[in-house]
Amino acid sequence: MAILELKDIHKSFRDNVVLDGIDLSVNKGDIIGIVGPSGTGKSTLLRSINLLERPEQGEIQFEDITIPLPLKSKDRKKVTELRKRIGMVFQRFYLFEHKTALQNVMEGLITVQKKSRQEAEKLALEALENVGLKAWQNHYPRHMSGGQQQRVAIARTLAMRPDIVLLDEPTSALDPELVTEVLTTIKQIAEQGYTMLLVSHEMDFVSKISTRVIFLDGGKIIEDGSPSEVFRHPKSDRAKEFFEKMNKLKEPDYFI
């Protein structure tokens, strides 16, 4: 049964149509990889789900919350409730530099969920342990690698106990050698049963972790199926062309 449905979502930036009538149904436990060319609306789609971007047309249905678009002032409480239940991990870490890892993870629990400091600390420590950083709880972001900072950001999201986790290119700001530790963390939380939507250029990772893959181009979903169907047997010429180019990029330029 779907816990999230997007219906006829449209989003433009001036004359540039970024999302052009998106329909998407997400079931509990889905791990949906979102792939496609750069600039085709992948990040905008994620940001539209929790209304960081505000579509001009459509409807968002999340369990018992229905939000018609464009947004009206009377729906502000619904937006707040939606954001409490959908967590997001961004390309950048957005950690507070003057707070420790533990304090960063506790922040939303105290300010948004109104937890007591004692309960917030307990939940934050559990989340840091989940991403392998409990021992780093008293370190400040400046003393941590980019990969560790992103894992703290993931812990911050998980501590809020979201129903859905959105991940927007979570490794794009990292040095190549730090990518693996973050992907390993994402794989571990996926195995815990979270419902996830992941935008990433790490195609091999997306193909292995996802239960379902959608391919966006020109603001439309033109492929939607299992990883095998989309990556190996795409139906559209555009997806075939895209994956052929991606495969060529992985081929060595020369042989010794």
Give the ranges of each region predicted by the language model.
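Conserved ABC ATPase signature
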Residues: 140-144, 148
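ABC ATPase NBD coupling module
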Residues: 67-87, 117, 230-234
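Catalytic Walker B motif of ABC-type/P-loop ATPase nucleotide-binding domains
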Residues: 165-168
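Helix-to-loop junction immediately C-terminal to a conserved catalytic motif
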Residues: 50
